[in-house]
């Protein structure tokens, strides 16, 4: 008997699920740009695994502190610590207001 894998997406099926009408990826999500200092929400796009942050950061808000290739460096508070995530633009949403 083997051991069950506890990988990156383990127990995240409900968190990464999309409703039927939301399925598919819009091209504008891949092409959106952000400025340094802009506040963004982490909204994971399950159809794209590249540059995906860990599911524990789903729904968190952070600040863009730089860019690395096509991805952005986003600083997020996790408990009492600040963490830097490397996230591609399809997993980010600008904060409105």
Curated annotation (Swiss-Prot):
Transmembrane segments: none
InterPro entries in the record: Ribosomal_eL21, Ribosomal_eL21_arc, Ribosomal_eL21_CS, Ribosomal_eL21_sf, Translation_prot_SH3-like_sf
Source taxon at top rank: Archaea
Gene3D superfamilies: Ribosomal protein L21
UniProt keyword list: Ribonucleoprotein, Ribosomal protein
GO cellular component, one term: ribonucleoprotein complex
An example Gene Ontology molecular-function term: structural constituent of ribosome
UniProt-listed PROSITE patterns: RIBOSOMAL_L21E
SUPFAM superfamilies according to UniProt: Translation proteins SH3-like domain
Pfam family, one: Ribosomal_L21e
Coiled-coil intervals: none
Sequence similarity: Belongs to the eukaryotic ribosomal protein eL21 family.
PANTHER family recorded: 60S RIBOSOMAL PROTEIN L21
Identification of the protein by name: Large ribosomal subunit protein eL21
Organism: Archaeoglobus fulgidus (strain ATCC 49558 / DSM 4304 / JCM 9628 / NBRC 100126 / VC-16)
Gene name as annotated: rpl21e
């Amino acid at each position: 008997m083997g051991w069950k894998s506890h990988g990156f997406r383990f127990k995240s099926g409900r968190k990464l699920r999309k409703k039927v009408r939301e399925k598919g990826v819009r091209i504008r999500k891949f092409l959106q740009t952000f400025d340094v200092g802009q506040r963004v929400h982490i909204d994971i796009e399950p159809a794209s695994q590249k540059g995906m942050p860990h599911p524990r950061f789903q729904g968190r808000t952070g600040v863009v502190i730089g860019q690395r290739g096509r991805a952005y460096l986003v600083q997020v508070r996790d408990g009492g610590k600040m963490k830097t995530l490397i996230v591609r633009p399809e997993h980010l949403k600008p904060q409105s207001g």
